[in-house]
Amino acid sequence: MRIVSTLASLLFVFLGLHLPWLANAANAASGRYLEVTYPPSQNTNELVLGVTYRLWIPEGAKTIRGVIVHQHGCGVGSRKGAETGAQDLHWQALAKKWDCALLAPSYHQEEKDNCRLWCDPRNGSHKTFLRGLADFAKQSGHPELERAPWCLWGHSGGGFWASIMQTMYPERIVGIWFRSGTAFETWERGDIPKPEISTAAYSVPMMMNPGVKENGDKRFNGAWTGSLAMFKAYRAKGAPVGFAPDPRTNHETGDSRYLAIPFFDACLKLRLPEAGGKTQVLKPVDQKTAWLAELLSDSAQSAASFKGDRKTSVWLPDANFAIAWKQYVKTGATEDNTPPPAPTDLKATTKADGINLTWQAETDFESGLTAFIIQRDGEMLAQFPEKPQNKFGRPLFQNMTYGDTPVAPLLDFQFTDKTAKLGAKHEYRIVTVNSVGKQSPPSQGAAIGR
């Protein structure tokens, strides 16, 4: 089922814009899609750019416990790439685990537009963001969406936006992942008004994630220095903030999702109120249960055993995350020794062009989804897709953009065996392959011609 607001539909028909995320919505995990679009406002202190918000709600979620916000960076390419953000299978897996919605904004910035018209939320984007949540709450029949807490992921200008939102709405934020972007140095230089930073803002869990190759880069050095400066300043105040430099990348997001998703998983576990409770107030972070590391090191210890200076240490939410963090800062990715879940609901149907196979699949929570092996009568028939793509990281079933969103058009969970002879008897099975090459057990079989 998919719900799209009337305003959004009319606006995009008028503008003649293509919506690849809607055209391919069937491939994503079971759930509902909603969309709202707001035109530019001419009112003082309101957003002067248009924006589209796209939301995914997992099937079976009775109460929405939070909203995972995947915020793109500056520029036309970033905002176009964000059109598929709500369809990302791996981020959907995180949302589904915690009964959260997945939200992907796309600000209608053109090349001539100053990014700060939206990435400084004080220029109106914070009001439109709240308006979007309120409208989604009405559309979806989930009134709790309007007040649900947020996980904020931001790349570049999206991190800039998130750092200011943190000063405005700290009580709403479960945690923040800053991928190569923050407004900290910008306000410290006086280029934008410096926000008031409350005690509550220093209680929000954060992870700074710049690319090591940004350090000294002519264009993106500020992403490195800004991330490091914000880390040092906030950690000195006792904030639960970590530093996870990506050794393989410059400003692109690379394979950062394999650490960002575990980070939010740990923060949601630490901070969400009990499911089914009456409150949406977040739990405080108990830093005694954390793991700590020296800055720019690749080893970590429990807080109880750490002997260094805590005010300069890297904060890590728990032991499991610390293991992944150590792997990531060494290699730019994380390990996974477990197989993905087997596909389900395999169906085989005779069509004019061959045997059509459809199935469902859960995304491997640790390492995502790369491909499916199609088996016929116990032997490998094909791999789908034949050559998974991703020039920024591990090849995936959903090819990735520079900004960690799926490349359109998106693939469905279906395959046609065009080599089967008409009327022949065959049994098919499907195997899931994750991004480290681990294979699931085969699915239940689906017979044809019997």
Residue spans for each PLM region:
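A domain-start/cap signature at the N-terminus of enzymes
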Residues: 21-67, 98, 150-165, 169, ...
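Pro/Thr/Ser/Gly-rich low-complexity, intrinsically disordered linker/stalk tracts
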Residues: 329-368, 422, 437-450
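Alpha/beta-hydrolase-fold serine-hydrolase catalytic core, especially in secreted/extracellular enzymes
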Residues: 237-239, 247-344
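Beta-strand-rich modules
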Residues: 417-438
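Cap/lid segment of the alpha/beta-hydrolase catalytic domain
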Residues: 96, 102-127
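The feature captures the conserved acid-bearing segment of alpha/beta-hydrolase catalytic domains
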Residues: 174-257
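Recognizes extended acidic, P/S/T-rich segments that occur
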Residues: 371-423
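Alpha/beta-hydrolase active-site loop
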Residues: 117-144
